[in-house]
């Protein structure tokens, strides 16, 4: 079993030497890296409810007063995994490309910036 969680990424680490790391925590690590670790691209951040027919990998930032599966998840990153919404709390310094706005936005002091056009 891993002994620690890395605070910035939330990844598990610290397996004992020789211990197999291929368990639920390693699976969680790989999924987390795939969802949030590479070039975060957000389809939209203005929606208050999840889209009706998301495709696996679709990523959003729920807007204020979110409803349904997104209720209480405002400012988090929501990824549809093909069966359910998976959420992650962003950390200071995360940068995301907001597709429908063509802007880069950074997370700081508990909120996403308005962004800069690119």
Residues covered by each model-derived region:
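Short consensus segments that form the blades of beta-propeller domains
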Residues: 68-70
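Feature captures the catalytic cores and cofactor-binding loops of soluble hydro-lyases/lyases
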Residues: 73-76, 82-91
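Surface-exposed loop/edge segments in extracytoplasmic proteins
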Residues: 85-86, 113-115
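Extracellular "spike/adhesin" assembly and maturation modules
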Residues: 1-66, 78, 92-99, 103-108, ...
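Short, conserved acidic/polar surface loops in the N-terminal third of protein domains
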Residues: 72-73, 108-109
């Amino acid at each position: 079993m891993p002994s620690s969680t890395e605070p910035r990424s939330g990844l598990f680490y610290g397996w004992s030497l020789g211990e197999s790391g291929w368990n639920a925590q390693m699976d969680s690590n790989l999924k987390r890296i795939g969802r949030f670790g590479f070039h975060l691209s957000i389809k939209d951040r203005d929606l208050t409810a999840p889209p009706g027919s998301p495709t696996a990998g679709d990523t959003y930032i729920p807007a204020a007063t979110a409803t349904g599966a997104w209720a209480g998840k405002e400012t988090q990153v929501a990824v549809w995994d093909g069966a359910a919404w998976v959420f992650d709390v962003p950390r200071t310094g995360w940068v995301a490309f907001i597709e429908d706005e063509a802007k880069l936005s950074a997370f700081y002091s508990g909120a996403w910036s308005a962004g800069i056009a690119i």
